[in-house]
């Protein structure tokens, strides 16, 4: 009787250990792929911006890291611009401009920027690497990223509300 009880105890401990290790493995696998996307041509992914309006100072940013030069269209904002940049992409006006804060003046630019260009209802990005876009608003809204290239696009994207 005692030997049978010990055998059941060992079996139970072994099964518990296997379940815990499997859970850790699958959690790790899930966490590694968090924020990584692959879109086929024409497919889209939506990202919700939830500003922390209850804070005195708040801002939101879209961190977009691309490993290739495939074209992705970003839509959902009226004006797009990178953090720490002075170039603004006005979607509604269909104008690019450089803001000069010291002179309180805007210089209009041609729509032929190398990595980002203006389209009808958004911007198309084709750079390789990481860029951070300022996406702060005073209410929640959705940003849509669409693959407008003819091949699958692999990227990492994350909206951070601070």
Set out the residue ranges of the language-model regions.
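Acidic, Ser/Thr/Pro
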Residues: 2-162
